[in-house]
């Protein structure tokens, strides 16, 4: 927003300098980006009255003028401007004057000179020569009542400053001189003076029929007829100056008045040519296919999401954005209809951008404009029109349809003090609210504030706390380093955190990655067997169109990324959410009805099992390497690995991970068909686990340090080739349950497997030999041989009963 300081000071004039005013506005949240002078420095330029104009005797394009510059004698000045004439008043640079610097950056000093033999004692100036504008078609002609000899800087108020303020979207109440003046008054305590908005004399009874059909578009609509205006009337110089210094251009008196009041009071309005309106006006949503030629010359096609104002024949305006060309006022307009309304912000937001333009009116309405002062502002517009353009005014037709109902906002003083980090008393808060003009009551420690009709940014407690901070002064809040006053909490030894899991995986030589939760539809089908993934309504890219239900796709993609960059060994892991449909999930603080969002941890290993080292034979990572990583991650939990099939994994080299009878994840080699599809030279091994299932590890159980060595027995069992090792281990655990020696059993571990190429006397063609090491230990005394033997035999019998196992001869 841009405005001249003099205009602001006509509303509120605190006894502070420009720099201090700029600083206070900035510290209150109205960031002053620039403060620029209206005109560059120059001196000895006064108002001159051209008394006589004669042709130059030796130049067709030059004139010899006699000018009264208030010096007591007429000055002879040679001038080449085409618009010089007797009787005009123009800026006159006296001998010794310094004009603004030119392109070379040096000031231009006026001296007595000769032009084609005629002496010139000064210079008549254009606006461009004074750096007031780019207009260079002739001299800058001043009003007739301008005093001769007066300093041009004072006459044109050229010592004024232009403020350029960068407003945040919530400060729509400051998109006017009145709004900024309210802030200055609150910050400095200076009284505010408003322009008169007394009702004008109503001399007509005419009303234009208006029907509001869309209360969700327009909450209040008001307007009046004014007849007999002179649209060719000249806009007063003071108004033109203020409009131009606010960054707008002067168009015509009627348009200038509408723009002036918008800048002054923040009230966008529209002036229709009454004689071009057919019948009455209707405020409604557009109909698909309707077209409108706008004031900017563009023709737009509307639909039922765009608000319009129409007459009986066609639409005449885009509601709250821009008027139509058909009913625009011209210099021949005699009768007008002045309209002002409250448009709901949600009904205006984004509409102008659909047509690739923006307007000052739309910028204000989409943020919220005061709905309570519409009539007063129409009176202000009417008074200016009658004063400048003449005419007769009819009554204001004010229709209140659906204005916002503002709920009181409560602010706890104690909470405000805690948020701001400063002590706050009731007196301080009360003073701030009074300076802001907020109506409030006090209920104990709580201030109950009625939000003003022009403050759409006050809705919750934090908004009021912000107001207290702004007016109290951010610079008065002491700068202190943040102090985290954390109470010591006991560590839950029965659970480990997500960070513990991440550190544990990283310790196994995996590197963490963070992938998008948005994946390709194809990945879901390939790696999760999910043919109905959760789609995204507005994906950031076509390949990220669905939510992932597995981490495998992203991990595999990053392996390919690294392989394309000549990496030979890649070990990655990720901890993140996956998404799946679940009708049992209800809405909650962090949940969405119908969708489960569990946390998973997954990893992938590709290439050599270990980094290249001269003393270690090179070999590719396999299922059992990664199984060891998973077992290490799960420790002290003991998991079962059950053979199973998964759409992403090799059918013979995949296992389901089971904890306490519950499936918590998968591990396996990537399926051969995906190796070819995704162009991988060799198969990586992948794994994925439910994070919640592996964080509960239970309390550690402490045991006495053994005083005697452990006893081991090795047994080799011959079983059918389809018998799984895990099944045998389960049989051993079942046999040990309840036995006297169970407490001594430390473990049964497979240490060898043998499959003969051909049948032998000891092992058949469809059999294999599995060698287990049984470890027993008592912490106090050496175990007796008979107990060890009994335990060993019982385990052998259990394997024989369950799977027909026999000792290998």
Curated annotation (Swiss-Prot):
This is Phenylalanine--tRNA ligase beta subunit. Belongs to the phenylalanyl-tRNA synthetase beta subunit family. Type 1 subfamily. GO terms for biological process: phenylalanyl-tRNA aminoacylation. It catalyses: tRNA(Phe) + L-phenylalanine + ATP = L-phenylalanyl-tRNA(Phe) + AMP + diphosphate + H(+). One of its GO terms (molecular function) is phenylalanine-tRNA ligase activity. Residues 706-808 form the FDX-ACB domain. HAMAP family: Phe_tRNA_synth_beta1. The gene is pheT. SMART domains: B3_4, B5, FDX-ACB. SUPFAM superfamilies: Anticodon-binding domain of PheRS, Class II aaRS and biotin synthetases, Nucleic acid-binding proteins, PheT/TilS domain, Putative DNA-binding domain. It holds the Pfam family B5. PANTHER family: PHENYLALANINE--TRNA LIGASE BETA SUBUNIT, PHENYLALANYL-TRNA SYNTHETASE BETA CHAIN AND LEUCINE-RICH REPEAT-CONTAINING PROTEIN 47. Binds 2 magnesium ions per tetramer. It is found in: Cytoplasm. The keyword Signal does not apply. Residues 404-479 form the B5 domain. One of its GO terms (cellular component) is phenylalanine-tRNA ligase complex. Mg(2+) binds at residues 457, 463, 466-467.
